[in-house]
Design a protein with these regions (language model features):
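Active-site-adjacent alpha-helix of alpha/beta-hydrolase-fold enzymes
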Residues: 1-13
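Short, well-ordered beta-strand segments
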Residues: 2, 54-57
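A generic structural motif
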Residues: 11-17, 243-245
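Histidine-bearing beta->alpha loop at or near hydrolase active sites
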Residues: 14-21, 25-37
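Alpha-helix capping and helix-loop boundary segments enriched in small/acidic/polar residues
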Residues: 38-46
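Glycine/threonine-rich phosphate-binding loop and adjacent beta-strand/alpha-helix elements that clamp
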Residues: 47, 56-265
Length: 265
């Protein structure tokens, strides 16, 4: 998007949460599924140098023009260089949810507190039984639902169905089911499609491992809707679209890791 608008863009995209890339003593607080698997290759001592060279060139006209690319970290810690991200050569596999196994029918919570009264779990077969799937980009979930009133929301966590490892999440208020920032009035009993998009994912799904979708009213640090038990949402299927890429290792970026940081577990 920024490149198309004519901007020069360079990115270093890691799993540091709100810590600096070289704050290795804080990285070990990251849990499994939130960067914990990447700790041995997490720290980037060179990020400050990158910023310095960027500002020297663009603010002062000093030095060579920085390379315009994305340094992206996969969930297992591997770094690589991409021309842009999400990669332009990604392909997408669509998984109709009626080919998966669904447990539960309604997503419903408690007003304000966010406690779950009921949820839905959907388990899908492996995208490939022979090769690992490298998910890279913005996974989407077009969820067919029925509203009970003008309110309610769904939080979705995507997991490796074999290991239970968290891969990513998405959340949507049903009033924004068409996407965008403007709400739409939803009527009781109305059937509609929630156009959900997961936060950016770059993760490896091993061959033979299926995908699990866990649907609740809220999760992470998102606020629960005020209507709570009064606004359950019935889930009637949909389509999961998973973007993925093939890489041969030629663009892997080897980063220096200090002994203390790499063993800070």
């Amino acid at each position: 998007m920024f490149i198309d608008a004519g901007f020069d863009v360079r990115g270093m995209l890691g799993q540091w949460e709100h810590n600096y890339p070289d704050q290795w003593s804080k990285h070990n607080a990251q849990e499994s599924g939130y960067g914990g698997e990447a700790i041995e290759n997490m720290t980037r001592w060179d990020w400050g140098q990158d910023l310095f060279e960027w500002f020297e060139y663009y603010l002062k006209g000093i030095g060579e023009k920085p390379e315009l690319h994305a340094q992206i970290q996969r969930n297992d810690g591997q770094w690589r260089i991409e021309d842009t991200w999400p990669p332009l050569d990604r392909t997408s596999t669509e998984v109709p949810l009626d080919t998966c196994v669904q447990t539960g029918t309604r997503v419903q919570g408690v007003s304000g507190s966010g406690g779950s009264v009921s949820g839905v779990v959907i388990e899908c077969d492996a995208l490939s039984s022979e090769v690992d799937i490298h998910i890279s980009g913005l996974t989407t979930l077009h969820l067919e639902v029925q509203a009970s009133m003008d309110g309610g929301q769904i939080f979705v966590e995507i997991q490796d169905a074999e290991t239970n490892l968290r891969i990513g999440h998405a959340t949507m208020d049903i009033r924004y089911y068409q996407g965008g920032s403007d709400p739409t009035t939803v009527l009781p009993g109305q059937s509609l499609t929630m156009l959900m998009e997961f936060q950016a994912i770059d993760a490896l799904l091993p061959a033979g491992h299926g995908i699990r979708l866990v649907l609740t009213e809220t999760g992470e640090d998102y606020l629960a809707p005020a209507c709570g038990v009064l606004c359950p949402i019935t889930v009637n299927g949909g389509v999961l679209s998973v973007p993925h890429i093939d890489r041969d290792g030629s663009n892997v970026l080897i980063t220096p890791q200090g002994e203390d940081a790499a063993n800070n577990q």
